[in-house]
Amino acid sequence: MLIIPVLLVFVLLFIVYNRVRLPVNVNSLINEIKKEELPEFVTGKTGFANNNDIKIAYEILDSKKPNGETIVLINGLGQSRLVWPTYFYQPFLDQGYNIIIFDNRGLGESDWIMDWTKENSYSLEDMATDAIAVLDALNITQAHFVGMSMGGMISQRIAISYPTRILTLTSVMSAGFYGDPDLVSVSKTFYANIIGVTLLYASKLKTDAQKMKFDLSKQRLLKGKGDYKIDNKKILQKAYYEIIKRKGFNSKVSDQHSLAIKISGSRYEELKNIKTPSMVIHGINDPLIKIEHAKKYATLIPNAKTLFIKGMGHDLPEKYIPDIFKSILKIITLNSTN
């Protein structure tokens, strides 16, 4: 009988703890953003691909000096294509690569799966076909793929199932089997923090401010103990942009994407057969997908290169981009069709 009261106290403590994780000026920041003219976060040519009657919204960022090759960036769980910072992809544009970003099914301007149930769910394989549908819609035969978190898992699946469509694979802060019982899972503190944030904000996404705070809270948690600052205002601006200029936030998409990861299971055996030149990048301080995941699945992909970054959490801080860019550019250049 004591279990429920103890759990309630536990959750309440973390709710209080998470309240102080947001910057003290968060409310004034939100009010400021609502009064200002928002930056434009959709700057490329946009369109829709069709995958079995599911519309996938994409955006093409063209290089001013195109070299004829394309890089596809695939975002993670519950993240729209706006998650990619300009400072990440601009160096590739400067090198002549066109960039494609798209909203995974269930969020952004792509179709939201309204008839989704646990019995009628979709997998990472299905999400991989969304990426292929985007290539088909644009008449692109092959591309370099860079995926972060769940996007890395989808990119792995593309290398496994569609090897003729992928030139190189870069899997960032990802895993080959997130449910691996032999590896270190997320800490109880981090898990409790996620629950606390969800109870505080996601359970009542009724106001713009709540939605913006939820998005910022997640980003601050994913940073972990990384020795760098995040741009609170930019994160809040993007969240508000999603609300007023796009379709807003789908409260069900995290459950959908989480189940897609779960039912897709392990790719360990299949990774051993990948012939695509591959790179595994991971933050040593990642609080969500521990570095042990990267160290394990990287050894399974034949000849995979690795870059493990001390201090980086589960995000893409600007201070580490020069090293990340150099590593990805090297593998892409060595395996160019030109």
Summary of predicted features, one role per range:
Residues 285-289:
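Acidic catalytic loop of the alpha/beta-hydrolase fold
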Residues 304-338:
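Catalytic active-site module of serine/aspartate enzymes centered on a nucleophile-bearing elbow/loop
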Residues 141-183:
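Conserved hydrolase catalytic core segment
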Residues 192, 196-197, 205-269:
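Alpha/beta-hydrolase
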Residues 169-205:
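Flexible "cap/lid" loop of the alpha/beta hydrolase fold
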Residues 274, 280-282:
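Short beta-strand/loop motif that positions the catalytic acidic residue
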Residues 54-112:
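Conserved HGGG/HGGXW glycine-rich cap/lid loop of the alpha/beta-hydrolase fold
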Residues 107-146:
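Active-site loop/oxyanion-hole signature of alpha/beta-hydrolase fold enzymes
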